[in-house]
Amino acid sequence: MNRKTLAALVGAIVLAVASSGVALAAGSGPAVTVQIKSLTKTLVKSASVHGEKGSITKGGTPRGKCPGNTAAGALDAATHGKWTGKYYASVPGIFVTSILGVKPSGSDFWEVLVNGKASNSGICAIKLRAGQRLLFKIAK
């Protein structure tokens, strides 16, 4: 095999390995479906996402306190980071204050339903499982 052919072959292999690594780095963990609804409209109809690598650090959350492979990571992926929250060490977790610019009014709040059932856990404690359906909606 001549040098040019060998160099081209090695280059193609390196490129293939590098591009597959980039695809893997885009998400972490199993695929879940995220839907987001305000009181009056659907903000995200249905997005298939993976959690995120590392930690979610919204609202002053210390690194490592909210893993990216949780509902918080799925929310972050589905909204491209366009949500806000406040970290509470006593819970510990993030209380969601707005999603895609929508803030609940009065005593309303963002809640998460997992496979159609209201979760008793915060978004940092809901570990992602393949095929899971997450609905973030404003509750009264």
Please state what every model-predicted region is.
Residues 2-140:
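Ubiquitin-like/PB1-type beta-grasp interaction modules and other compact soluble beta-rich domains
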